[in-house]
């Protein structure tokens, strides 16, 4: 049995979606980020940077959502793709660029509007560029790394925030197709609902 330490965030949803995709039983221990529970000493013992998600399985604890996805893909033998190098590239693009930049956009536009015109404009433009880059890539690709994989599972929860990104999907037809196809997967529907 797996234990997922999470809150209702895109990074945590990656893991609940993956656990649903591989049909594994798991429990969720909610860490309330708004109350600062991630900074409690007990939690810092399993997450040195005070971040969620964290996954506990048997005698090991894994932190960082990308590392957890790779662990679960290796554990299950699923969703790492036929070309693991390509899958890893797209997973790392999500971990190092897509997620952090959309997260910054969210901070400036949703939590702190009007505090920094420079920040709002910068991250809005970056968010638009991310949407366009993904749309361009998906013109010739059904999924990010060829077949449905942990790269898509990692990226989907961030694009699912498109209504609050104030960008929308209307002008990104390939990204919309990709998003709608993944959104219909039963495991995604169940796993997204943390």
Question: Where are the model-predicted features located?
Answer:
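GST-like domain detector, emphasizing the conserved glutathione-binding G-site
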Residues: 1-121, 135
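GST-like fold's C-terminal all-alpha helical module
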Residues: 97-186, 191
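Short linear loop/turn motifs
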Residues: 87, 193-194
């Amino acid at each position: 049995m797996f234990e997922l330490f999470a809150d209702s965030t895109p990074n945590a949803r990656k893991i609940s979606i993956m656990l649903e995709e591989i049909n594994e039983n798991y429990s969720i221990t909610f860490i309330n980020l708004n109350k600062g529970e991630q900074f409690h000493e007990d939690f810092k013992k399993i997450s040195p940077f005070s971040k969620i998600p964290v996954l506990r399985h048997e005698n090991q604890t894994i932190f960082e959502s990308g590392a957890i996805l790779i662990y679960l893909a290796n554990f299950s033998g699923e969703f790492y793709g036929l070309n693991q190098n390509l899958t890893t590239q797209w997973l790392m693009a999500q971990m190092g660029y897509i997620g952090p930049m959309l997260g910054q956009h969210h901070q400036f536009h949703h939590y702190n509007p009007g505090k920094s015109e420079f920040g709002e404009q910068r991250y809005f433009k970056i968010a638009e560029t991310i949407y366009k880059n993904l749309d361009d890539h998906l013109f010739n690709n059904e999924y990010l790394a060829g077949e449905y994989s942990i790269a898509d599972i990692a990226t989907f929860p961030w694009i699912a925030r498109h209504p609050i990104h104030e960008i929308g999907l209307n002008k990104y037809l390939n990204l919309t197709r990709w998003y709608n196809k993944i959104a219909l997967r039963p495991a995604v529907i169940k796993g997204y609902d943390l």
